[in-house]
From Swiss-Prot:
The gene is hemF. Pathway: Porphyrin-containing compound metabolism; protoporphyrin-IX biosynthesis; protoporphyrinogen-IX from coproporphyrinogen-III (O2 route): step 1/1. It is found in: Cytoplasm. GO terms for molecular function: coproporphyrinogen oxidase activity; metal ion binding; protein homodimerization activity. This is Oxygen-dependent coproporphyrinogen-III oxidase. Its main location: cytoplasm. A divalent metal cation binds at H98, H108, H147, H177. The record marks H177 as: Important for dimerization. Homodimer.
Length: 309
């Protein structure tokens, strides 16, 4: 099977949104997701869910969208001029979780499908997605676990998949104007359309399903750790990097805004509170300095555990 089954993809994505929201609400134990279904005037719509002011999660947004249009925006055709003049559909689930506890990392995941069609010509389609982790106070055990899950889900699809998509993630989530990684990475892939539709779809499902396996054990380990104003202020400062990346560099944000997407859903990735501080430098040998020294530089986390891959 090499012709895309959009109904199959949509069913999976809606189920994935349900599963992730259910797991997050259960872990929070205090707040529930509110849902808003929306329609896009130019075509399509979506289902946005957000949890706010929880006991564990200050804000968690999990968005499903299925949008369509008669013509692609500049952000899409700039890199792929062959798509000009084609109608398109884009389906995806995207989520960003901003915990309250500074010892809990922010996490992001996204799985998506894109197809551009023109009468009389073959459709152009691909999958993309991934997940990445942004700690404020890093724990080696958590970083290894995160990457071990990523490695394991890639293995059935080939030995080369994890290192390739890990590097892509490290390269993509890099804040160029800060010369600094956004976090400790994970997986990132795009333009996936070979060897065939079902293989690509199966891999995309593995990534989507892998998110909870990667993130929820970290939530369970860290959500009860005590914290104070110092940790909170550092968390708010580091959230600024998240905002900078999403508004300046993230292709998905730019695509959404340029296609007339729903602004509230697109900017749901931004943290509810954030601060900037001129020329901040962490104290030498502090827990804050350890983030810059031990976690933000790119490294092979599986090698620490002595794994081969």
């Amino acid at each position: 099977m090499n012709s895309p089954d959009i109904a199959l993809i949509k069913t999976y994505l809606l189920t994935l949104q349900d599963n992730i929201c259910g797991a997050l609400a259960q872990a929070d134990g205090h707040a529930e997701f509110t849902e808003e279904c929306w329609v896009r005037e130019e075509g399509g719509g979506g289902r946005s869910r957000v949890l706010v002011n929880g006991a564990v999660f200050e804000q968690a947004g999990v968005n499903f969208s299925h949008v369509s249009g008669a013509m692609l925006p500049a952000s899409a055709t700039a890199h792929r001029p062959e798509l000009a003049g084609r109608s398109f559909q884009a389906l995806g689930v995207s989520l960003v979780i901003h915990p309250l506890n500074p010892y809990l990392p922010t996490s992001h995941a996204n799985v998506r499908f894109f197809i551009a069609e023109k009468p009389g010509e073959d459709a152009v389609w691909w999958f993309g997605g991934g997940f990445d982790l942004t700690p404020y106070y890093g724990f080696e055990e958590d970083a290894i676990h995160w990457h071990q899950v990523a490695h394991s889900l890639c293995q059935p699809f080939g030995e080369q998949i994890y290192p390739r998509y890990k590097k892509w993630c490290d390269d993509y989530f890099y804040i160029k104007h800060r010369q600094e990684a956004r976090g400790i990475g994970g997986l990132f892939f795009d333009d996936l359309n070979s060897p065939d539709f079902m293989t690509c779809f199966n891999f995309t499902q593995a990534v989507g399903d892998g998110f909870l396996a990667a993130y929820m054990p970290i939530v369970a380990r860290r959500k009860a750790l005590g914290w104070g104003d110092r940790e909170r202020q550092f968390q708010l400062y580091r959230r600024g990097r998240y905002v900078e990346f999403n508004l300046v560099w993230d292709r998905g944000t730019l695509f959404g805004l340029q296609t007339g997407g729903r602004t509230e859903s697109i900017l749901m990735s931004l943290p509810p509170l954030v601060r900037w501080e001129y020329n901040y430098q962490p104290e030498a040998d502090s827990a804050e300095a350890a983030l810059y020294r031990d976690f933000l530089p790119v490294k092979d986390w599986l090698a620490i555990k002595g794994e081969t891959h």
